Amino acid sequence: MSTSKAKQPSVPALDNYIPDDEDFFDPFASPTNSPNQSPKAKGGAKRSEPDGGLGIDEEVSVAKRARVPRVKLDETRLLSDKGIPALRKRAGTLRLKGKGHEFSDAARLLSFYQLWLDDLFPKAKFLDALAMVEKAGHKTTMHKARTDWINDLKPNMTAPDNDGHADIGHAPVAQPQSSRIAPIFEKRQTIDASTMPAEDSNGVDDLFGGDDLGEMYDVTPKATRPVGEPDDDDIEALMAEAESSIRQPAPIAMSLFGSGRPAKTGTEAQRANGSPNDEDLDAVMAEAEVHTVSHGSSTARKQRAQTDPGNDDDDLEALIAEAEGVLKQKPAPSHKTKDKTSSFDDEEAAMAELDLW
């Protein structure tokens, strides 16, 4: 009996089984640290649950990202080593075939520029890069650099002295030229002067050779000289020139022997040299009159045709009448008696010279 009474729990021990804390039954209450909890668990709870429960009051530090500089295709990049200087070096390797290979040459030229722009500015497409290069090419810095490149390609105007230094203070001495050269060389100089490339608006030649590509493909437009009927002023000037050549008195040159026959007269000298005589002058005047009459009649016919297009028969009859009148007015070539007298004088002079011998 004594052992059973000792094993029964006491009443106060049963009452202490349920804790007296009112927050025990509160589901939203934060857990409290029990006294039997280990120190490591207490420290972990402090690290995981800062003050305030949610960590809103803490200051968040955000590291700023380094900004990469934006690369632009401007005049500075064009003047760099990968810009136009590299393009000038690569231009020596470009070979074009010329006429008959226009398509392949154009494709080769486009690929040449595309590879250069891909190395210079790979970020942009080919057409966009070309637009950027064109925009940057209008800057003052690019104009100055272009002028310097062109001046570098020009030959030096001053020749170096014996010491190896160029004479800057004195102008270059021009080479003496003969006053008379052969006609074939005159023609060649005229052709060379007409085919020389003209300078651009800034007074400098083109950096890439001007119209060399146009001459290679024979597509350079050439100015065509207008071919039309000569004006009345030209005809009058031609007639006046022929008359003045006849009216000029020709000097009579004496023979070497003094009293012998005179040398050829001015008229004979002109005839020997191919100068126009009276017959040639008459022919020129007749041709000019025919041309003037035909030109005037054609102009009148055009005006008449514009005003009254139904008078074709009248125009034909008028044209026939004008042609007959011109044929009647044309002077016949007259043989002067001067030729006979001059030949007679020549014979007498020859006989006189024979008598002197």
From Swiss-Prot:
GO terms for biological process: DNA repair; DNA replication checkpoint signaling; meiotic cell cycle; replication fork arrest; replication fork processing. Pfam families: Swi3. Residues 344-357 have a biased composition (Acidic residues). The keyword GTP-binding does not apply. GO terms for molecular function: DNA binding. One of its GO terms (cellular component) is replication fork protection complex. This is Chromosome segregation in meiosis protein 3.
